[in-house]
Amino acid sequence: MSEEKIIGKGTWIDKLASELLEREKKLGRSLDVINVESGLGASGIPHIGSLGDAVRAYGVKLALENLGYKSELIAYSDDLDGLRKIPEGMEKFGLEEHIGKPVSLIPDPYGTHDSYGMHMSSILLDGLDKVGIKYEFRRAKDTYNQGLLKNQIHTILENSTKIGDKISELVGQEKYQKYLPYFQFVKNAIDFTQQKQQNTLQIRKLSNTIVMIQK
């Protein structure tokens, strides 16, 4: 009976790192530096699950390094996400007028950072610093303003039907079969929300917000 080969330190993270390496080799990508990313939700107050996502990503980075590869953890703030709802305990700040706006364009209600989104991200970054996780911080706002993803966005839009079908196949989400995987930033918009219990239609004017585009 042959012994099963132990990868790295024998953990599931080591196995994941090994599978990642095999995938990158098959795709012919450079292995000079392998970036691992953890998204930082910037629309709400971070919690233990938010920290857990970053810790697991950091574990993959360490496993890759243990296998002899250089790796970096990117802590990526999704600060172009729209504010979906008011976080519990923050009702007093009058954030209702900012619902739907990218959180990077909402003023920080505490006045300590350049935006609401940066304030929320900073809370999680402080946690990463305290537990000794090394990372490179990036923001969606800067990434898009600098046009760093324009080629990737073009490719995604060209293949939106294929991508929508694959998302539906893998996770059962059918939204992107009807809508483009793209959120348009608009200066002015109107939101129609049907109130089923009252059988009424609520109409709100929105400014500097993001909307989905139907195919």
Regions found by a protein language model. Name each.
Residues 4-7, 42-51, 103-115, 145:
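The substrate-binding groove and active-site-proximal loops of carbohydrate-active enzymes
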Residues 146-157:
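Feature captures the FAD/FMN-dependent oxidoreductase FAD-binding
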Residues 94-131:
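A glycine-rich helix N-cap at a beta->alpha junction
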Residues 70-71, 108-111, 122, 129-140, ...:
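Short secondary-structure capping/junction motifs at helix and strand boundaries
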Residues 80-97, 152-154:
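Charged, often glycine-rich, active-site loop that binds/positions anionic groups
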Residues 45-49, 83-88, 148-149:
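A short acidic (Asp/Glu
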Residues 1-48, 59-75, 90, 95-100, ...:
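Non-catalytic terminal extensions that flank enzyme cores
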Residues 75-78, 136-148:
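Acidic carboxylate-rich catalytic motifs and surrounding loops in phosphoryl-/glycosyl-chemistry enzymes
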